[in-house]
Amino acid sequence: MKNKMLALILAGGQGTRLGKLTQSIAKPAVQFGGRYRIIDFALSNCANSGIHNVGVVTQYQPLALNNHIGNGSSWGLDGINSGVSILQPYSASEGNRWFEGTSHAIYQNIDYIDSVNPEYVLILSGDHIYKMDYDDMLQSHKDNNASLTVAVLDVPLKEASRFGIMNTDANNRIVEFEEKPAQPKSTKASMGIYIFDWQRLRNMLVAAEKSKVGMSXFGKNVIPNYLESGESVYAYEFSGYWKDVGTIESLWEANMEYISPENALDSRNRQWKIYSRNLISPPNFLGANAHVEDSLVVDGCFVDGAVKHSILSTGAQVREGAEVLDSVIMSGAIIGQGAKIKRAIIGEGAIISDGVEIDGTDEVQVVGYNEVVGVATDED
């Protein structure tokens, strides 16, 4: 039986711009909003859009990501006719090859895709924060009789040179693609979300491999090839909240935006939930000295200090006399007595010793996974 659409989430990037936060884990596994990991948004969008088969393409530091995804049950993707498959580089008869780019990762997994037998493939990035109904995008793809549909977001003209820009005609058919142009002709930025007719994409990737034509990345190679070949390529305009959290500053900004009860992600919308794999934790404990204001505090936290406009992830501790302002404290991190944290991201399991001050007023500060700042005590 032919499946309608298979989603492939590209989650193998190293995320070097996130510095210490991705030294031990893949970028899509980085925590967000206290309760989630970044990849939860793409997985939840798939589940909410009625996509039952998902492949997650991994490469760099995949252990935490693989453990988080498991069998897909947290997203309802563990049924008889559904599932999540973790796709990692492997040694084949022609030799061992790491994924060389986004489209090369798809080529290396042709056998898996053929086993699902989809009519369409949906290509997603695993490191963006947003909500999207992919079924609406698929309907647009069908209505336009497109070979390829690219999701685009209207961005300010002054920022357009940071993105791949799609120039379209009056019917939203893409006539030109410009990769990070110095003088952009439009403001329709690619979101890195694509729907392809699978057989057409398959034929192109196989032909390119046989002829040794470089076809490693969608933006650099595949989209220009489709346009040059006269394929019908259309833009799908998205107007909701979307955030590329590939830098420390953008990750911090997205978390701060998420604190607001009226945040653009509409996190309390029960019609489009964001699911995650959440371990059972005890209730929060607020001590006699605790003062919590305008913050998100997740299960299992211990607070006996002051927390303002911040996020405390599962099991985080803010001890007596400590102050946390405009910061993200990830799971299991400990803020010691009298410590002061301002505009910072404190990684999972990190320890900020008693009396330490971290001030990100000029630039958001980061403490890495399990990093110790100051002299840890036996109590830590």
UniProtKB/Swiss-Prot annotation:
Catalytic reaction(s) noted: alpha-D-glucose 1-phosphate + ATP + H(+) = ADP-alpha-D-glucose + diphosphate
Gene: glgC
Origin organism lineage: Bacteria, Bacillati, Bacillota, Bacilli, Lactobacillales
EC numbers for this chain: 2.7.7.27
Disulfide bonds, paired cysteine numbers: none
Complexes and interactors: Homotetramer.
Record family assignment: Belongs to the bacterial/plant glucose-1-phosphate adenylyltransferase family.
Organism: Streptococcus pneumoniae serotype 19F (strain G54)
Pathway: Glycan biosynthesis; glycogen biosynthesis
UniProt keyword annotation of ATP-binding present: yes
Protein name as it appears in the record: Glucose-1-phosphate adenylyltransferase
GO BP: glycogen biosynthetic process
UniProt keyword list: ATP-binding, Carbohydrate metabolism, Glycogen biosynthesis, Glycogen metabolism, Nucleotide-binding, Nucleotidyltransferase, Transferase
Residues that hold alpha-D-glucose 1-phosphate according to the record: G164, E179, K180, S190
Domain of life, source organism: Bacteria
Described purpose of this protein according to its UniProt entry: Involved in the biosynthesis of ADP-glucose, a building block required for the elongation reactions to produce glycogen. Catalyzes the reaction between ATP and alpha-D-glucose 1-phosphate (G1P) to produce pyrophosphate and ADP-Glc.
Principal EC category: transferase
Molecular-function annotations in GO: ATP binding; glucose-1-phosphate adenylyltransferase activity
